[in-house]
Amino acid sequence: GNAENSSLLNSALHYDPLVPVKDESGNYALSPTLGMIPNPVSMLEITDQTQTDRLLANGYIEATFWKDLKVKLNMGIDKNQGRRSTYLPKSTLYGKQEGGKANINENRTVDLLFELTANYTKQLFKERDRLEVLLGYSYQQENWDGLGAGSSQFFTDLFLWNKLEAGNVARPPVSSSKGKNELGSYFG
């Protein structure tokens, strides 16, 4: 039943080529010997939409305070958010077992980077002799959150994932998550 979560190509490779695409009733036929392998043509009716938006930016400011001291501030952001909506209609193997199955998942991640460095360079007695000192601080923060909702046992396939409440499930699957990681360090 869950082989529909693999791939169309996997089903096509393992499906019995002697079985017709549809049976006498007009439903997608299943192999009598490989009933757990979905009809690969039926998988073309699965609706799966993914949208991802990403912002990636970096920048820095550098200043020279004295002839020998440079300070640099480096900042960056990586913001990634996505939404995936899927619907397995009743014409598919797993969709038939579930009475149609819809899922919506959304995730968002924001990574922030902050680095501050100070570089001191002093020419000593001879041209080849010099003193270099680098000190710095680095801070990185990752924030993420997500949510998911689904339903099954729909009386029609027309709604796709747009009316999860139309499913007839006592406890539809709902999930959410949120978290944060931080990392800070001094170096020199």
Where are these regions (language model features)?
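A conserved hydrophobic secondary-structure block that centers on an alpha-helix together
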Residues: E62-I77
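Surface-exposed loop/interface segments of Gram-negative outer-membrane beta-barrel transport/assembly proteins
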Residues: G1-R54, N74-S185
